[in-house]
Each structure stands twice: as C-alpha cells, then as structure tokens.
C-alpha cells in the first residue's frame, strides 16, 4: 500500500512539471535589427516562412538563398548563446524534434 501511495504521489508531481524555457520565465530575448547592421552582400536577413520546418530543410533553404551565410548553426531552444553580431551566421533555434521554433535571422 505504501508503494502505491508513492506511485500516486509521483504521478501527481509529474503531472505538475513544466519545462523551463525563456518564454515561461518571461525573459526578454534580444532581437538584433540587422537591416541597419551593415552586413554587406546579405540579400535576405530573416526567414519567417521556415518556422515549423525541419532544421536540415531550413538550413538548405537559407544556404541556397544566401550563399554568403557560411555558418548556419542548429541550437536547442533555450540554450544560452553569445550576443555578438556576425554577418555570416544564422542560428536555427530548434526543439527536441529538430523543428525550427524561432524565426531564423542573420546575426
């Protein structure tokens, strides 16, 4: 009977668990305005149409549309990243299923 009570208590606690993300904590995420950043040769800076797509597909589209972007990175959403601006980099923030969850942009 004690084991059953432990299992019930565990299930109740597990049902209340919520993963911690920046949005849940209401942390302001820095959005860089690359239109005024002075990145020469960058023809497209944002890809809102890639939200919800697989990361490999998004990476191919970005590199096809803008060959100067040589550093396309896949980053798990919520992972801390540097805030420096790089004109050859796009970060793809993905979930655990490897789908894009934030609008990819140069920076």
Curated annotation (Swiss-Prot):
<keyword id="KW-0732">Signal</keyword>
<keyword id="KW-0722">Serine protease inhibitor</keyword>
<dbReference type="GO" id="GO:0005576">
    <property type="term" value="C:extracellular region"/>
</dbReference>
<keyword id="KW-0964">Secreted</keyword>
<comment type="similarity">
    <text>Belongs to the protease inhibitor I13 (potato type I serine protease inhibitor) family.</text>
</comment>
<dbReference type="InterPro" id="IPR000864">
    <property type="entry name" value="Prot_inh_pot1"/>
</dbReference>
<feature type="signal peptide">
    <location>
        <begin position="1"/>
        <end position="22"/>
    </location>
</feature>
<keyword id="KW-0646">Protease inhibitor</keyword>
<dbReference type="InterPro" id="IPR036354">
    <property type="entry name" value="Prot_inh_pot1_sf"/>
</dbReference>
<feature type="site" description="Reactive bond">
    <location>
        <begin position="83"/>
        <end position="84"/>
    </location>
</feature>
<protein>
    <recommendedName>
        <fullName>Proteinase inhibitor I-B</fullName>
    </recommendedName>
</protein>
<dbReference type="GO" id="GO:0009611">
    <property type="term" value="P:response to wounding"/>
</dbReference>
<feature type="propeptide">
    <location>
        <begin position="23"/>
        <end position="39"/>
    </location>
</feature>
<dbReference type="GO" id="GO:0004867">
    <property type="term" value="F:serine-type endopeptidase inhibitor activity"/>
</dbReference>
<dbReference type="Pfam" id="PF00280">
    <property type="entry name" value="potato_inhibit"/>
</dbReference>
């Amino acid at each position: 009977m004690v084991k059953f009570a432990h299992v019930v208590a565990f299930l109740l606690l597990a049902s209340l668990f919520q993963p911690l993300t920046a949005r849940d904590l209401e942390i302001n995420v820095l959005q860089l305005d690359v239109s005024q950043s002075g990145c020469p040769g960058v023809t497209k800076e944002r890809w809102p149409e890639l939200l919800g797509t697989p990361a490999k597909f998004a990476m191919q589209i970005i590199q096809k549309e803008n060959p100067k972007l040589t550093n396309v990175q896949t980053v798990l959403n919520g992972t801390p990243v540097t805030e420096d601006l790089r004109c050859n980099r796009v970060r793809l923030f993905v979930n655990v299923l490897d789908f894009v969850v934030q609008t990819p942009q140069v920076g």
